[in-house]
Amino acid sequence: MGVALRKLTQWTAAGHGTGILEITPLNEAILKEIIVFVESFIYKHPQEAKFVFVEPLEWNTSLAPSAFESGYVVSETTVKSEEVDKNGQPLLFLSVPQIKIRSFGQLSRLLLIAKTGKLKEAQACVEANRDPIVKILGSDYNTMKENSIALNILGKITRDDDPESEIKMKIAMLLKQLDLHLLNHSLKHISLEISLSPMTVKKDIELLKRFSGKGNQTVLESIEYTSDYEFSNGCRAPPWRQIRGEICYVLVKPHDGETLCITCSAGGVFLNGGKTDDEGDVNYERKGSIYKNLVTFLREKSPKFSENMSKLGISFSEDQQKEKDQLGKAPKKEEAAALRKDISGSDKRSLEKNQINFWRNQMTKRWEPSLNWKTTVNYKGKGSAKEIQEDKHTGKLEKPRPSVSHGRAQLLRKSAEKIEETVSDSSSESEEDEEPPDHRQEASADLPSEYWQIQKLVKYLKGGNQTATVIALCSMRDFSLAQETCQLAIRDVGGLEVLINLLETDEVKCKIGSLKILKEISHNPQIRQNIVDLGGLPIMVNILDSPHKSLKCLAAETIANVAKFKRARRVVRQHGGITKLVALLDCAHDSTKPAQSSLYEARDVEVARCGALALWSCSKSHTNKEAIRKAGGIPLLARLLKTSHENMLIPVVGTLQECASEENYRAAIKAERIIENLVKNLNSENEQLQEHCAMAIYQCAEDKETRDLVRLHGGLKPLASLLNNTDNKERLAAVTGAIWKCSISKENVTKFREYKAIETLVGLLTDQPEEVLVNVVGALGECCQERENRVIVRKCGGIQPLVNLLVGINQALLVNVTKAVGACAVEPESMMIIDRLDGVRLLWSLLKNPHPDVKASAAWALCPCIKNAKDAGEMVRSFVGGLELIVNLLKSDNKEVLASVCAAITNIAKDQENLAVITDHGVVPLLSKLANTNNNKLRHHLAEAISRCCMWGRNRVAFGEHKAVAPLVRYLKSNDTNVHRATAQALYQLSEDADNCITMHENGAVKLLLDMVGSPDQDLQEAAAGCISNIRRLALATEKARYT
């Protein structure tokens, strides 16, 4: 079960968060098999069904408490099973919406209760419990991988003293059998998968276009692509959708229906969400079933299309049959034999996993995602695209057209590597992690003479003696090895294998010559990949132990070049390279002293520099960062940071900058007093060093103590002065980022105001890249929390560019700009400008943004806008559908969105007409539904919203009817004074209704309110006293009525 879920299920990308299962046929098939297994478990294995899990399986369920009947204790918001463990804890506990289940028996019953919603529940459970084996049987059973067999599990459990070991053994075996079943089932499913190619889709569309137009004799009214641009692989979908297998999107107008927006993908054809009204972009979400091709889809959707196709006798079968034949061909005998040989010695599960990967390679190797655009519009006079080139300054790579000339051995090797990479740890790496497709020189290409000369030298390397080898290496270095032609000439004739073999000889001169060449050519991304494929990295890691300092330096520099992608970084770590590289940093014992004439000391410094360079490349992996820390890298880096050698400082600070994203490192950086040296190096003349120091400060300044250290060591002034140089955008982004994070502290903001940094930041609001704008706006958002700075921003003309940025699409930028605009809106003069520029409408439109952070930030920004606008009530009503939109946001699952919307509703409800409108839109039941929350921020603003909404019609009574009063009384037990004040005011308003007074009294409100009457907060005093007065008045009236 664990292996199948980890290897076969297809997940969406989720940034730094957890992904969700994609809605694909394979995922649905896996979930259905799991449901069948769990449903039948209670009948087939009644004894094992009672076994209590080590940890409960938890997820958010869509089931309501009312769905549970006999066998459960049901209340309004909770459900407990009558079945309990030996400690009396229920085996099923539901507290809407979270559910916790601790036995297979309760899982089986839940699926029976879910009925038609069982697939949704299974999906939610799998998404929330990525490693169910550990939760069911404990962390000791996390070793149940592909190579686990029955004897392994049996041996493990029989060594355990747990009296339930026999049941655990049976469950472990059952889960293992389920895992094997899922792998076999998926193998069959994958082998039958549809795999359309861009060429097939294009031919179908072109043929349909020929028979489209007005009139009854055509099959369609029209068919057209949504995009005129075509990539070099034949796809028209954007690259981030090509990764999901999507080829293109077409708009089809049949004779007998509305226009359909259709997605054509490698997995088939389906209806998507259509074009959006606002931007005209495609809503990529699938809205129906997947069909094997476009014609089958249209036959199903349009009877007229099917009828006219039959009349015209159009046949798509010939081309499609060819495609099917190519797809359906069994792997060639040589490939099958190689596959068997490759996996010999492994068990049955490994064989099946390799077969799955092999079939996937067979189905997808005809086309791969591409970033190279080509247009179908005829632009005359334009040259053809250049061949792949690497930008030496930025290291960015323009991806070439995929090669189809891969050898069979390479195909099998890559398949095995993909399995290994899936099992290995993943890391959140922002650098170039893509391995470039292989790219061979074409035989017919016009190659320069150097290409052939280098190939001759490689032959001497292969067959010559030691002297000839050294001469050949020296001669090869005379060529311009920075040119791609020379690099690929060495590779194409087998020179890389020879150079790597030379590293295993005992001749130091041969090793040095080989490493010098490898260091130069490993700047090429393809060469880097080839070096890893040929096993060159472990050999270089071993050379780091050499007593020869020149060898150490060259090996470390070459590792630094090669470790630019994830697989290479993993290989370095797995062969002990991180520990050895950290040890190189200890060579520079005297690095803190001025450079001396001693060659020995200069070499020590160079060894440390090369080690730092390699660690910089390796530190882009989360696991490697932790390995560097455990190997004692931080104290050594801190010592090297005091050096006067500028070329040493850049890789040292670069490594610290990468590692500072980890909390453990930030604490260690403070402990080692590194901030002081980072600040000192901000005054360096070297722009790259300044950039990395600023970036390291940006990463560390999340912590208040670090922000104070930057100020105390005089770091704010150089940061402010660096804002004036805007030519170097990378440095400007780092500097503005550091200023943003430092501005979180008010003391730092005061200093920035002294240094005139706020005026400079306002000047950077235009004509800058988004990376800079995000940081500039973030810094202004923090600075504008103070009145003096808001005035500066307004007087410098900063309001208009801020409002202009509200129409962007960058999520981080929108979050920051809404915060900045909201901060400025506190000042009435600034609010007038925002209103005149239509800023409030733009903020309101951001409530439709799909990102919760943007929605929340926009809602917070609306609060001061509504509060300080001249005619706020009329302004809000002028937004068509605006009030309904904000009320509907109360259905969100995000706590920050809910809190911000409640705050906005509090301000909106100050106008009676608006309060009447939102009441009609159902604000009362939605607010009441949120009352059972433990989040103090949400409680505060929710109570304020309820208090304000009570002032219309019979809303007070309605809140009581929707059970909002009792949860509000519990808020008085909170330790937050803001919650107390808002709650007391809400209860005072609600106590105007007699039924609510009774509910408050029954829930112990009087005692809690009496304590608050003595509060130093006057508003809290008055509200608490008023509420007690109303309750007392009702009690007296009741008493009087009883005796009369």
From Swiss-Prot:
Listed PROSITE patterns: ARM_REPEAT (PS50176)
Hydrolase keyword on record: no
Pfam families attached to this UniProt entry: Arm
Family matches, as InterPro entries: ARM-like, ARM-type_fold, Armadillo, GSKIP_dom_sf
Bridged cysteine pairs (disulfide): none
Tissue: Expressed in respiratory epithelial cells (at protein level).
Keyword tags: Cell projection, Ciliopathy, Cilium, Cilium biogenesis/degradation, Cytoplasm, Cytoskeleton, Kartagener syndrome, Methylation, Primary ciliary dyskinesia, Repeat
Skewed-composition ranges (Basic and acidic residues): 319-348, 384-401
Region: Disordered, residue numbers: 316-348, 378-446
Primary localization: cytoplasm
ARM repeats: 484-523, 525-564, 535-577, 622-661, 663-702, 746-785, 828-867, 912-951, 953-992, 994-1033
Role according to the record: Component of the outer dynein arm-docking complex (ODA-DC) that mediates outer dynein arms (ODA) binding onto the doublet microtubule. Involved in mediating assembly of both ODAs and their axonemal docking complex onto ciliary microtubules.
Quaternary structure note: Component of the outer dynein arm-docking complex along with ODAD1, ODAD3, and ODAD4. Interacts with CFAP61.
Protein name: Outer dynein arm-docking complex subunit 2
Species the sequence originates in: Homo sapiens (Human)
Gene that specifies this protein: ODAD2
